[in-house]
Amino acid sequence: MRIAILGTRGIPASYGGFETFAEHLSTRLVARGHDVTVYCRAHYVSPRQLESHGVRLKVLPTIRHKYLDTVVHAFLSALHAVPARFDAALICNAANAPFASILRGTGTPVAINVDGLEHKRKKWNWLGRKYYLLAERLSTILPNETVTDACVIQDYYAAKYNARSTMIAYGAEVERKPDRPVVRRWRVEPNRYVLYVSRLEPENNARMVIEAFKKVRTAYRLLVVGDAPYAHEYINDLKERARGDRRIIFTGFVFGQDYRALQQNAYCYVHATEVGGTHPALLEAMGFGNCVLTL
């Protein structure tokens, strides 16, 4: 089959959960003999990169703005996919649901992976929240199939929209390699640091984690792994709160083998998110057998 994946920043993954999902899904589909194209954003993947591990990459522009980045790129991706006549398309993020009509209208079957309850995120103004609620409803109407990644999200769509969805839980790739020298790059010792991984946005409660850790009397360190492209003020506030406590270390985004080394050598993992879907980082921490503290 010829399959298109739309609605993420693209692959190779170096941002968040949907990108990690798209990379794992696309490469596994290719390994099974399918022809897969992942649509990527030009400020995230080089336009010169045409392929990744057998997956075709189509890099398109977008408008780099908090409210437009995702939907503009998904719209352009859907338009580009029409003449390609894919056998199936997967759209990530309920925000992109309106564009399912473009593909279905030209005969391409469409599934949407809706993610979490984005309308509850504080980063959106009232108009953004209203749009997300509309897009949620459309994600139960326009595609051929609505996909949820957790039972609680499946139950939400059933209760709010009386909509059936297919729940497909994420897995985690666990490869144990005691790569201890890697973690020392961040001035930590194996099994002597607490790991927090997330996009640094208010609903993921990095502020709460930092303030709680500051009250703990311990020589262990806190590694804050993550970033966010449109949350500079919030991130600066986090770093200001951590100022003076040398135990708290901000790493930015970490992916690949370095990230896996951080997971498998952590003393424990802290999960403090409120409104997202299933976070791959949580599953990976569980897969590595980490002690997990949840909000």
Regions found by a protein language model. Give the residues of each.
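Conserved donor-binding/catalytic core segment of Leloir-type glycosyltransferases
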Residues: 4, 184-217, 223
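N-terminal strand-loop element at the rim of the active site
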Residues: 8-14, 28-65, 152-158, 228-230
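Short, structured helix-loop element that forms part of the nucleotide-activated donor/catalytic region
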Residues: 47-49, 221-247, 258
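An aromatic- and histidine-rich active-site surface loop
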Residues: 69-82, 86-115, 277
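Membrane-proximal helix-turn-helix segments that form the acceptor-binding/catalytic region
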Residues: 79-82, 128-146, 155
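Short alpha-helical donor nucleotide-sugar binding micro-motif in glycosyltransferases
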Residues: 253-254, 261-266, 285
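Aromatic "clamp/platform" in nucleotide-sugar-dependent glycosyltransferases that forms part
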Residues: 274
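Short hydrophobic beta-strand element within catalytic cores of glycosyltransferases
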Residues: 291-294
